[in-house]
Amino acid sequence: MVNARDTLISLPFSAASGPGVEWRITDSYVAYEDALAAMEARAAAIADGTAPELVWLLEHPPLYTSGTSAKASDLIEARFPVFPSGRGGQFTYHGPGQRVVYLMLDLKHRRPDVRAYVANLEELIITTLAAFNVRGERREDRVGVWVKRPDKGDGYEDKIAAIGVRLKRWVSMHGIAINVEPELSHFAGIVPCGIEDSRYGVTSLADLGLPVTMHDVDIALRQAFEQVFGEVHGVADQMAETTN
């Protein structure tokens, strides 16, 4: 069966023109409050035309974030700090071993279509996972990217990557989180994305038996980004940057 969102990625999502996309990788853990403030400031500058678009790859220390649809009952145990994020969605976990990708893209100059943007984020994840022979799939009734788990039983699937976005003046914020090798037990403090069905769990590349490094994922992400969203260039060729 063809997912309705599959049809949304058929049109180009690249920018018609502009100074290019900055590609930034931060090696140290970034406090959530600092990341949120930096995102807000950069998104405003992009909207004002004073800064290029930015794709920021990072890791957070262990924490939970709540989206605009989060229910208090889905916070089972606040094992780690909880932050309101302003993005769509419900509760999620971020922590070491998870590649968080914050995308600040000017959709006004790309394609001002929220549903198409989310579909392209899904495609970014699916293409990245394919580099490691992992078949990620989108689901019409569940946000994120999923992998089938026949080893767990008929109809079982695990989420391997989460998606949460916010738009302000048609500039995107937040983005995706791919589970490379996080501590999966940390997800037990919440009902991830409000999904209570026991057939649907959480997995990672390591959990699937793949010895993939964060650097491997970063290379695959950049290749996938250029395929889905267009070339990064200019200051984007700084493949690694450490910020404090």
UniProtKB/Swiss-Prot annotation:
Substrate binds at R87, G88, G89, Q90, F91, T92, Y93, H94, A162, I163, G164, G175, I176, A177. Keywords: Acyltransferase, Cytoplasm, Transferase. It is found in: Cytoplasm. Pathway: Protein modification; protein lipoylation via endogenous pathway; protein N(6)-(lipoyl)lysine from octanoyl-[acyl-carrier-protein]: step 1/2. It catalyses: octanoyl-[ACP] + L-lysyl-[protein] = N(6)-octanoyl-L-lysyl-[protein] + holo-[ACP] + H(+). GO terms for cellular component: cytoplasm. The keyword Acyltransferase applies. Its EC number is 2.3.1.181. SUPFAM superfamilies: Class II aaRS and biotin synthetases (SSF55681). GO terms for biological process: protein modification process. HAMAP family: LipB. In the reaction, the free carboxyl group of octanoic acid is attached via an amide linkage to the epsilon-amino group of a specific lysine residue of lipoyl domains of lipoate-dependent enzymes. Catalyzes the transfer of endogenously produced octanoic acid from octanoyl-acyl-carrier-protein onto the lipoyl domains of lipoate-dependent enzymes. Lipoyl-ACP can also act as a substrate although octanoyl-ACP is likely to be the physiological substrate. NCBIfam families: lipB, PRK14341.1, PRK14345.1. This is Octanoyltransferase. It comes from Afipia carboxidovorans (strain ATCC 49405 / DSM 1227 / KCTC 32145 / OM5).
